[in-house]
Amino acid sequence: MAAAKLEDADALIDSVETFIFDCDGVIWKGDKLIDDGVPETLDLLRSKGKRLVFLTNNSTRSRKQYGSKFRTLGLTVDEEEIFSSSFAAAAYLQSIHFPKDKKVYVIGEEGIINELELAGFQCLGGPSDADKKIELTPGFYMEHDKDVGAVVVGFDRYFNYYKVQYGTLCIRENPGCLFIATSRDTVFQLNGVQEWAGGGSMVGAILGSTKQEPVVVGKPSTFMMDYIAKKFGITTSQICMVGDMLDTDILFGQNGGCKTLLVLSGVTSHEMLQSHNNSIHPDLYTNQISDLLAVKAATV
Ligand SMILES: [Mg+2]
């Protein structure tokens, strides 16, 4: 069924208890708010007693680091309301009781290492492998740690062949080693100027050399939906998922049984939404989240 344009913001707000917002392309683009109405929109929803949750597939930062980004942008958000795919990787390993004497090899940035260490896991790789190079000289043999029991792969601006080879050796040679992806995002708005290759490109490299499918912990996997619903004791039918990407945010909301609202302020254009090639249809769409303020204007 084709998505309907958001006309009655009041009815939407009244029909749900919790809003889960994606961040890139919804709340901000790079280091700027999507529009000046964002703080007022969040304030309005809070004043109506709505629970707000922020969920990003971007794993470069930890929850704590995202907390300071929200504050820098002038938004009052509690760190407990923020969930990132870096946190999801740690929460997933905890949920399966990943042994604390095993290690995790990280292809990704600081956020993943921070969250894993905060959860008490031993990590290798991450930013410390950023400058490593491999010289394929005759007879060169690369050692790897046999205690690595999981390889976590996320978006990584310092991706290199050393990391690919290290992760590949762990997955192929350590019995039972897990392959975990924080997300498989195609592209995202890193700096607000153009689209940049997302975490899916790093995950694809490891998939290519191991022929293994990863466990995805970020959107559209329902792992974080189940986690958030359980943590706050909410029913997913009482949630509205708000995002700018069809194959991550909207699919995540639909997989979880939520209402879905697509905003056109990020990577998805109106043409892409209406295209015959698109099979993912949100319940509603609108230009930007501050359109939810229409309710306020209408009642004045
Ligand atoms: Mg987004």
Language-model regions, residue ranges each:
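Asp-based, Mg2+/Mn2+-dependent phosphohydrolase catalytic module
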Residues: 1-23, 28-50, 59-80, 90-300
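Conserved glycine-rich Rossmann-like NAD(P)H-binding loop of the short-chain dehydrogenase/reductase
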Residues: 53
